[in-house]
Amino acid sequence: MSTAMKSKLHFRYSMVILPIFVIISHIILGFPLGIFGQTNTDATYQFVTKWGSLGEGDGQFDGQNDVDFYDGKVFVADYANHRVQIFDPYGKFIAKFGEGGESDGQFHKASALSMDSEGNLYIADQFNFRIQKFTNDGTFITKWGSEGAGDGQFLHPHVPANDAEGKLFVTDRDLANVQVFTDDGEFIMKWGSEGEGDGQLSNPESSIVDSQGNVYVADYGNDRIQKFTNDGKFVTKWGDKGTADGQFQGPSGLSIDANDNIYVTDKNNNRIQVFTSDGQFITKFGEPGSGDGQLIDPEGVGVDKESGAVYVADTGNNRIQLFEYQL
């Protein structure tokens, strides 16, 4: 990302007096000011720009389900167009790859994606019942998975997540579990079963991994977030059904920032909620509608860890929206 882009994302804040350590942390470490030490409850994320509409052309979407950010580029899983599209941070189209089909590099509903630390891209190829791995320019590397309930098989693979050791965590809505693989698809273990108890899941949508290796799962059907160790031991949970702060109606997408704060797309409440890694509510943004900053059935969310910019897959509006934190 260029210096000009970083400056635009970093410094469009109100004129306030801040402790010097917060300013230093923001300038040197790249932490968003509001999340690092902000106590102003009126501060939140504000709309910056948007792009996309319903269609098949470059920059158009049909049910885009997920979004991620890596090395100055925005990657979007364009679900019903069976492809991935790549943009610059402000929505200028760069490239695309994929088409409908069953061959290597083809998709039958590209439902979700994630990036590893080396820039490789993992796509949940939903109705081909597999994960496909690509370079970040769309070159096919490998694939794994088939239809079924056995180890390494899928019925409804959803958002994969990567840890610092190269392991990949894949949620499966219909199997109500999380499967763990090496970065080339070798099955390691799995955990989870259908239910409402601690460690049980109901239609899990996505997962994310923090800097300590803990795994967070959007437990969609139970309207909560669950936190696990990376070998599947239950740590904590938060949320229940409702519209208040910290409650959910269909938590779907997850992302994480440089401070291990967790971003959740609260799909049927048409908003994004932000929490600490132990589930303490920080802020929220979004409301129902099609105007700037409004959302309809948002699914995916991605955070640029350097600038703190937040990208939301505003699925019902067939667009991506960019937000930044402002005081």
Positions of predicted regions on the chain:
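N-terminal secretory signal peptides that target proteins for export/translocation
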Residues: 1-11
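Signal peptide processing junction and immediate N-terminal pro/mature segment
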Residues: 28-38
